[in-house]
A protein has these predicted regions:
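Conserved small/polar residues in nucleotide/adenosyl-binding loops
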Residues: 242-244
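Aromatic/basic-lined ligand-recognition segments
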Residues: 138-207
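Basic, nucleic-acid-interacting segments
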Residues: 100-136, 141-158
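Beta-strand elements of well-folded, non-transmembrane domains
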Residues: 56-63, 77-85, 132-136, 155-161, ...
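Short, conserved charged micro-motifs
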Residues: 214-224
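Long C-terminal interaction/binding lobes of large macromolecular proteins
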Residues: 202-207, 223-227, 239-240
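A common structural junction motif
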Residues: 229-236
Length: 244
């Protein structure tokens, strides 16, 4: 649209508190995603993932004892973009997800959302991640005292061009291990100087990624128990100090 140099002087420069968005006005808004893009310049290059990263909201999850837990969650939703398309309406990533915000979340819910992303954003592939910190009550190794342990978790879902869906759970398990450097220095002190030296411990993280079979389920509690059985030295949430 051509404008004269002084046309901006005629534009309203004040906020209009009485303006109402009507259905007709909403329909008149430009929609680049669903409009023809022949008039838009740019290289015909596909993009593997485009979307919104880390929008936050509280979601409901099943707790370790079957109770409902509301947990703050960071969500990332992306779709693929074909070479003949110039973009997507980013807000639809959030708006579609918000239609499921009252569901009890699990990797199974992701399949429904991913299909909505493909259909309503007209994409060949879609990906979804939900990252959250999951609380579980844990008993200390020696004292018998209990406290909450928080586990960083991520539910990930992927749908491909053939509508095949992959469900992946990422689970972080923090445990105590002997520092290898301190261990070697301690052994050196014993051998060379006949000196008693004790290596210190350190926090270590095991990141477990499990792809769930389409016909199977696994809970975060089961994953936690598998980690405890494999690594017996989880960091402790409650200690009883003994004064000598």
């Amino acid at each position: 649209m051509e404008t004269s140099p002084n046309s901006s002087d005629k534009l309203i420069r004040e906020y209009d508190p009485n303006f109402q968005v009507t259905p007709e006005y909403r329909d008149s808004l430009p929609d680049v995603q669903n409009s023809g893009c022949a008039e838009l310049d740019g290289a015909r290059v596909p993009i593997l993932q485009v979307g919104i990263s880390g929008f936050r909201l509280p979601l409901c999850y099943v707790g370790p004892d079957g109770e409902n837990l509301n947990i703050e969650t960071a969500v990332t939703g992306t779709v693929s973009l074909d070479a003949d398309k110039k973009g997507i309406n980013m807000s639809r990533i959030i708006r579609i997800f918000y239609e499921y915000k009252n569901e009890t979340f699990s990797p199974e819910i992701f399949a429904r959302i991913l299909r909505e992303y493909k259909d309503r954003l007209d994409s060949k592939e879609a990906r979804l991640k939900a990252q959250f910190s999951y609380p579980m009550m844990q008993e200390s190794l020696r004292s018998g005292l209990q406290g909450f342990q928080f586990y960083d978790c991520c539910f990930e879902g992927i749908i491909d061009r053939a509508d095949r869906i992959r469900k992946i759970i990422h689970f972080d398990f923090v445990y105590s291990s002997a520092c290898p450097c301190a261990s070697e220095l301690s052994e050196h002190a014993r051998e060379k100087r006949n000196l008693l030296a004790i290596p210190h411990s350190q926090r270590s993280k095991a990141r477990i990624s499990v792809e769930v079979h389409p016909d199977k389920e696994i809970s975060l509690l089961e994953l936690r128990d598998l980690c405890i059985n494999g690594l017996q030295t989880e960091t402790q949430v409650m200690l009883s100090l003994i004064h000598i």
